[in-house]
From Swiss-Prot:
Pathway note: Porphyrin-containing compound metabolism; protoporphyrin-IX biosynthesis; 5-aminolevulinate from L-glutamyl-tRNA(Glu): step 2/2
Protein name, UniProt field: Glutamate-1-semialdehyde 2,1-aminomutase
CDD domains cross-referenced by the UniProt entry: OAT_like (cd00610)
EC number: 5.4.3.8
Keywords, ordered alphabetically: Cytoplasm, Isomerase, Porphyrin biosynthesis, Pyridoxal phosphate
GO CC term (a single one): cytoplasm
Length: 427
């Protein structure tokens, strides 16, 4: 028995399912989860001392790679000054100013502790601002585990086959309307029936929780137009895409300006952080200046702010994003070439430094339905073949991959060599 297997057995005694987030349990691929002990750059080391090229990046935050020296130093120096004060700090102001500079649609921003907190509060704020109860989300989009947002969700909920979680009262769920991602007509139909009751549309501008599915042409533009016509708030959930698919997130990449934006992952540099921000007129509805309440003991934590600020400063390095995009292109073009050569039906998607691949006969995957109809057995076999060769991918066919600035051309080539052997097991 490996050390990871021993730890998993032990963990299940004290922790539900042996994990603190469901997708980590390997239910989507079978077998026991790998326990990790350290990480550096593009690599992680497991409890048995095996090294892996990592394309999960802590589910998105590690865009610079693990243990980046500048982020680590900023974190250590901040920790020496105090782990938490529960008071305003100057670093909060600097973080807010930095976010506003990079994401122009954000005129004011509130820091919280997680992406779930950010989306939960953005929904509450939109309801308070509009005086309406209903919200519209998209099938397969995941916005954290708040009650009103777990209806037909993606990510771990989709991996486990339970997109509607028990424990959510019908009175909550009835206010959550769902449309089809990348199908603007489905949105128009809902708004034609009850547009004056809908407080907001919340969307992953690049769907990253049913693998990686970018928006089709006109989809985000259509959402902006519908919200303008009906007085609804447009919320971009950029917890995953923020600072990753482009310096200013998906709204920068696709040139669409939302009313509110939620952030997380990258802005913490690896520490637990979330944020929501947007138009001044909307943000001024949040307490203490407005009637919509939100609070948090550790919101704006000085150590997390220091880590995130250091990460954002590093992202301004000239050429960094171009390198990320080039690495993704090299990886995905290489994967497609090897899959085609092996006779394995597969297609790939990409958006900035996010990527995904689907085992399917379809020439492209643009919808939730297509993602769920892909060959899951092929994915499981491929996943374990890559794992054996020291390549760590997300243990679910419904999670995308993430490139970091620490990945080298050699890492990409080693990944492609491993993939060639893995594809051979599928024919």
């Amino acid at each position: 028995m490996s050390r990871s297997e021993e730890l998993y057995t032990k963990a299940q005694i004290s922790i539900p399912g042996g994990v603190n987030s469901p997708v980590r349990a390997f239910n989507g691929v079978g077998g026991s989860p790998i326990f990790f002990e350290s990480a550096e750059g593009a690599y992680m080391i497991d409890a048995d001392g095996k090294r892996y090229i990592d394309y999960v990046g802590s589910w998105g935050p590690m865009i610079l790679g693990h243990n980046h020296p500048a982020v680590l130093e900023a974190t250590l120096q901040a920790a020496k000054r105090g782990l938490s004060f529960g008071t305003p700090t100057e670093v909060e102001i600097t973080m807010a100013e930095t976010i506003r500079k990079i994401v122009p649609s954000i005129e004011k921003v509130r820091m919280v502790n997680s992406g779930t907190e950010a989306t939960m509060t953005a929904i509450r704020l939109a309801r308070g601002y509009t005086g309406r109860d209903k919200i519209l989300k998209f099938e397969g989009n995941y916005h954290g585990h708040a009650d009103s947002l777990l209806v037909k969700a993606g990510s771990g909920a989709l991996t486990l086959g339970v997109p509607n979680s028990p424990g959510i009262p019908e009175d909550f769920a009835k206010h959550t309307l769902t449309a089809t991602y990348n199908d603007i007509e489905s949105v128009k139909q809902i708004f034609a029936e009850m547009g004056d009751e809908i407080a907001c549309i919340i969307v992953e501008p690049v769907a990253g929780n049913m693998n990686c599915i970018p928006p089709v042409d006109g989809f985000l533009e259509g959402l902006r137009s519908i919200c303008d016509d009906h007085g609804s708030v447009l919320i971009f959930d950029e917890v995953m895409t923020g600072f990753r698919v482009a310096p200013g997130g998906a709204q920068d990449r696709y040139k669409i300006k939302p009313d509110l934006t939620t952030l997380g992952k990258v802005i913490g540099g690896g520490m637990p952080v979330g944020a929501f921000g947007g138009k001044k007129e909307v943000m001024d509805y949040i307490a203490p200046v407005g009637p919509v309440y939100q609070a948090g003991t550790l919101s704006g934590n000085p150590v997390a702010m220091a880590a995130g600020l250091a990460a954002l400063q590093q992202l301004s390095t000239p050429g960094l994003y171009d390198q990320l995009y080039q690495r993704v292109d090299t990886l995905l073009d290489g994967l497609q070439e090897r899959a085609d050569r092996a006779g394995v039906p597969m297609t790939t998607n990409r958006a900035g430094s996010m990527f995904g691949f689907f085992f399917t006969e379809e020439p492209e995957v643009t919808t939730y339905a297509q993602a769920t109809q892909c060959n899951m057995e092929h994915f499981k076999t491929f996943y374990h073949a890559m794992l054996e060769q020291g390549v760590y991918l997300a243990p679910s066919a419904f999670e995308g991959g993430f490139m970091s600035a620490a990945h080298s051309e050699e890492d990409i080539q080693n990944t492609l060599n491993a993939a060639e052997k893995a594809f051979a097991k599928l024919v």
